[in-house]
Amino acid sequence: MIAVLQNPQNAAISYSGEPQEHNLLGSYETKAPNVETSEIAASSSSSEAPEDLAEEHHRNEASLQQPLSEVDRHEQPAASDNTRSGLDIPPVTVSTPQSSDNPLVESKEAVPVTFKDEGKGTKADPSHLLTEALETTNGEENSPISEDEATAIAVLKVIERYGVNFEKTGESWQGLTSFIPTVVEQVKKREAVRMILPAFPFKSPNARDKVLGVMPDLGEELALYHLNGLCENIGRVYEPGADVYISSDGLVYNDILGVPDETVWEYGEALRRMAVEKELHHVKFIRLFELLEHPWIPLTSAEQAKSYYLAHAQCLRRELMYRFEDRSFDADAAIRSDNDTCLTYRGYIKFLTKDLAPQMDTQYTSKKARAAHIAQIARSMIVRGKMFAAAIKANRADYVRLSIHESNGARKLSISLVPQVRGVLGYTPWHSSIAVDADGTLRAVHAEDVRETHELVYKNGQPYYFREKSKLFDWVEDGLRVKFEPLYPCGLIIRPSDIDDSRPPPSISHLPMHKVRQLSTGLSPVVLRGFRETLKEELYVQKASELGTILPWSFGIIQKVRDAGRTDKLGNNVTSNEAMPMHYDGMFKFEEETDPVTGEVKRVQKPPGYQFFTCPATAPKGSGYTLFASSRLFFRYLPLPWTTERLQKVTWGMDNDGFWDAKLKNLPLVVPHPVTGLPCMRWHQPWDSTKTKFSTCAVTIENDEQELASVVDDLTYDYRVCLRFSWEQGDLLVSDNTAMLHTRTGYKTNCERELWRIHFD
C-alpha cells in the first residue's frame, strides 16, 4: 500500500540516529549518528545507466570492455549508417530572435540561421542532419519541412554541440531526430524547450581523497552555469529559450549507502540557493515528490519544509519501489547477460571502492569482505536505478533527456558538467574537487591529486576549490589581503577582504600591477572590484604605467567612451550606444617595418597587447554588457571538421566604410600568443547596415570556405566561450588583447554609461 503524505505538523520524523527501514541492505539498518560527508553520487550515474533494460536486450552490443571508472562508462554504440542521403534539400531559414545580451539587442530584425545543401557529403554538414530530420519527420523524400520543425532542429543542433560524442567525432547526435516531435510540440505552443537531467544527488563520502565536504562548491557552481548557458544558447535561436530540470536521485540511493536524508536535503537546498543567487533562471529542480505526482506543498518556513521532506523521504522510496519496480528483473542475471548492465556494475564497483574506502578501512579487515560488501551495494543500486529511470520515463516523457554518462546517444545526450578535456565526460562535481591553475585552466580532480601543488580556498567559511600555488596569488607580501573569485566561463574578480566599518577598502595605489598583468595572460579579464580611488585620473594613468608601456591615442592617453549622440554615417560607433561587432583593438593600427635581409619596407599591423579599463558610470541593469570571448575556450569548443591546424592557415580580409573606411587583406585568422605561444583568434565580426547606422564591415575568407565566418561568429558568442560582464561603478579591468576578443551590447540613448580605456604593451 502506498503511504499517504502527511501534514508536516503531524509527521513523525526519523533522525540520523534512529533506525530506518531498508529493504536491501541489512548492514545499514541504523544510520550513523555523526555522518559528516554525504555518500557518493553514484546516484546520478545509477539513475540512468541501467534504464530501459527490457527494451535494450534486443540490441547487438560490442564485446565487453575493461572495467571503467565512474566517469568513463560507455554504452556500446549501436550500428548505424552514417552515409549521406542523396536527397536534395531546399534552403531552410530559421528566424533567430535576439537574446537580451546579443549585440543586436536593439535590433528589430531576426538574424537568419540557414541550412544549405552544399553537397559536402559529410556528417559535419548541417544539411545532412536536416536530411535525416526531414526523412524521419515526414517519411517521404522531398516533403516540405515546416517552420516549427526547422526551429526544433535548430534547437536540437544547439543541444547536440554539448554532446561528448559530437565533440569526439563531429558526427550527428543519433537521438536528434527522435526528439524532433517533442520539441516541435513545445515550439508550436511557443513554450520554453524542456530538458531533464538526473543528477546532483549528494557529495561523495570520501572527503579524504576526493571531495571537499558535503555541500556544493565551485564544481556545482560551474555545472549550474554550464547548464544555464546551454539554455541561453538555445535562446539565441529560439526566443522562448529553454529550461533544464535537475531531477536529483539523492533519495533513491542514500539509504542503501548510509547517507542521512538530512544530508540529501541540505545539499539540494544549497544547490537551489546557488541557482537563485547566481540568477541562473533557466535551471530548475524536480523533487522526487513531483516525479511521483505528489505536489511539493509551499511551506511558510525553511524548517517546516525540511521537516516535511524528512517525514516523507522513506515513504517516497517505498512508493518508488511499489510503482516502478520490475519484479521480473534479476540484477545478477542482467550483469551476466546484458552488456550495459555489466558496464554499469563495473563502474559502480570502481567508484564505490574509492568512495567508501575510509569506511571500509575501519569496518572490514579483509579485502574479500570489502569486495563482497561493495558488490552488494552495486547490485542494489542497479535495481534502484532502473526504478528511477522508469519513473522519469513515465512522468517526464516530453522532456529532452540529458545524461552525465556515456551512451550511444539514441535516447539521451551525454554531456559533461564541468570543464574537461575535449570529448571526455570526466568527473562530476559531486565526485571531485575543482583545481584552478594560474594559466586559467579549470580542472575537475580528486582532492588527493592536487593537495601538494594547490592550496585550499575557502568561501564563507566552507572549503570551495583548490588554487595553484603561485606568487601571483600571494598579495599578502604586497600588504594586501584579497579574495580571488573565478568567473564562468573565463575571468577572475579580485576583491579586498577584511573590510568593515573600521577598515575601509585599500586604494588602488597599493595594487601589485605586475601580478595583475601576469594573471591577465591566462585569466583575462581580471577585474579589480571594491578598491578606492579608481576614478582619479592621475592615479589611473600611474597604475597603467606599472602594467607596461602606455600606447597613447592620437588625442591622449585615456579614451573616455560614452555616447556622443551622433547618428550620421561618419560617426564613430565606439562613442555611441549601439551594440558593436566582436573584434580586437588595434585593427587599423599599422607601423612600417624594414626587412633586415631584403630591406623591403612593409606596413605591419601592431595591435596593443592589453587594455586597462575603469568604469565611472554603468548602463541600466541588463544592458551595456562588455563581452569577452576567450581564444583558449574557442579552440576547446571548435566543432569538427574545423580544427586549430586548419584555422592557422586561414587568411581573411575586410572592407569597411564610414568612420573606419579601410580595406584590409591577408590578415591571419590565428596568431601565437607572445607569452604562452597558444593559438589566439584575430577577428572582426561582419557588420552590415541592418546592425548599425555607422561603419559597416564586410568580411571575406580568402583561402577557405566562407562558411567559416558564420562558425567563428557563432562560437565567439557561445556561453561556453564568452563572458557577459556586467560593470559596477569603480571597477578596474585588465584584458589581454591577444588572448581575448571583445564587444559590447547596446544600451539606452542618453544613458550615463562611461568607460575609460588605456592601451599598453
From Swiss-Prot:
Statement: the UniProt record of this protein carries the keyword RNA-binding: no
Induction remarks: Expressed during copper starvation via the regulation of both aceA and macA transcription factors.
Phosphoprotein found in the keyword field: no
Pfam families linked: DIT1_PvcA, TauD
Pathway, per record: Secondary metabolite biosynthesis
GO molecular function terms attached to this record: oxidoreductase activity
Sequence segments annotated as region (Disordered): 24-128
Compositionally biased spans, kind Low complexity: 36-48
Enzyme class: oxidoreductase
Entry's EC annotation: 1.-.-.-
Listed Polar residues bias regions: 93-102
Function (record text): Isocyanide synthase; part of the gene cluster that mediates the biosynthesis of the isocyanide xanthocillin and its derivatives. The first step of the pathway consists in the conversion of tyrosine into a vinyl-isonitrile intermediate by the isocyanide synthase xanB. Subsequent oxidative dimerization of this intermediate to form xanthocillin may involve the cytochrome P450 monooxygenase xanG, whose expression is coregulated with that of XanB.
Family: Belongs to the isocyanide synthase family.
Protein name: Isocyanide synthase xanB
Organism ancestry: Eukaryota, Fungi, Dikarya, Ascomycota, Pezizomycotina
Gene (name only): xanB
